[in-house]
């Protein structure tokens, strides 16, 4: 499973990249606004930190303007992945861009039918929002399983990018289903490293080592 971080905070991105475990970054208009920086500048800075796909989302709602915005965004760096909403105009834009060799991440997916359409439009990634799905009493992981089955049935090249990840269990369940990618806020990724028994074990080892009076260095 590929690990993306969902943030526009370059300090957090650099921290995650330093682990060697980060494969890409997702951003959205809300995260860009929170950064307080210029959109193009933020994406350019992120692309210098992470060589993998960096999702930059168009904000237009019509196909023609989406294409114009995508042209600006994909000139920033070779690893920019254009992010479009799952609408008719978004999928028209996805098809045009993917036919031209541009990576496209189709976002705001809430049904397997929508994911099927994105696969037919040639999306590099489909982003189903599991947390928001769960929020309204639906089964987010069930959605991921349905998309996995459909994509396997028809051998789509589109990767399932699990989004709206709220906690480590979302990541675990997505991995068990066979999702290709997950994107999560920095805090959720950090939580993956933690376990009380690991902490307890380290404390025990350190206490015993201190008693020996030795040093490796």
Swiss-Prot record:
One of its GO terms (cellular component) is cytoplasm. It catalyses: D-sedoheptulose 7-phosphate + D-glyceraldehyde 3-phosphate = D-erythrose 4-phosphate + beta-D-fructose 6-phosphate. Keywords: Cytoplasm, Pentose shunt, Schiff base, Transferase. Its main location: cytoplasm. The keyword ATP-binding does not apply. The keyword Cytoplasm applies. The active site is at residue 83. Its EC number is 2.2.1.2. NCBIfam families: fsa_talC_mipB. This is Probable transaldolase. It comes from Rhizorhabdus wittichii (strain DSM 6014 / CCUG 31198 / JCM 15750 / NBRC 105917 / EY 4224 / RW1). The lineage of its organism: Bacteria, Pseudomonadati, Pseudomonadota, Alphaproteobacteria, Sphingomonadales.
């Amino acid at each position: 499973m590929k690990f993306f971080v969902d943030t526009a905070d370059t300090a957090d991105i650099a921290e995650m990249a330093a682990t060697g475990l980060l494969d890409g970054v997702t951003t959205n208009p809300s995260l860009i606004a929170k950064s307080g920086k210029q959109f193009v500048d933020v994406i350019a800075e992120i692309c210098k930190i992470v060589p993998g796909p960096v999702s930059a989302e168009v904000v237009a709602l019509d196909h023609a303007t989406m294409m114009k915005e995508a042209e600006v965004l994909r000139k920033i760096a070779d690893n920019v992945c254009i992010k479009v909403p799952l609408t008719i105009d978004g999928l028209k834009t996805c098809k045009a861009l993917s036919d031209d060799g541009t990576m496209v991440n189709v976002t705001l997916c809430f049904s397997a039918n929508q994911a099927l359409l994105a696969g037919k439009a040639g999306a590099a990634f489909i982003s189903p929002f599991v947390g928001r799905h769960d929020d309204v009493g639906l089964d987010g992981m069930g959605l991921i399983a349905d998309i996995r089955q459909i994509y396997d049935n028809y051998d789509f090249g589109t990767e399932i990018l699990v989004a709206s990840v709220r906690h480590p269990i979302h990541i675990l369940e997505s991995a068990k289903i066979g999702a290709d990618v997950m994107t999560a806020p920095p805090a959720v990724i950090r939580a993956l490293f933690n376990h009380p028994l690991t902490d307890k074990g380290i404390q025990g080892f350190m206490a015993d080592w201190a008693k020996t009076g030795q040093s490796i260095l």
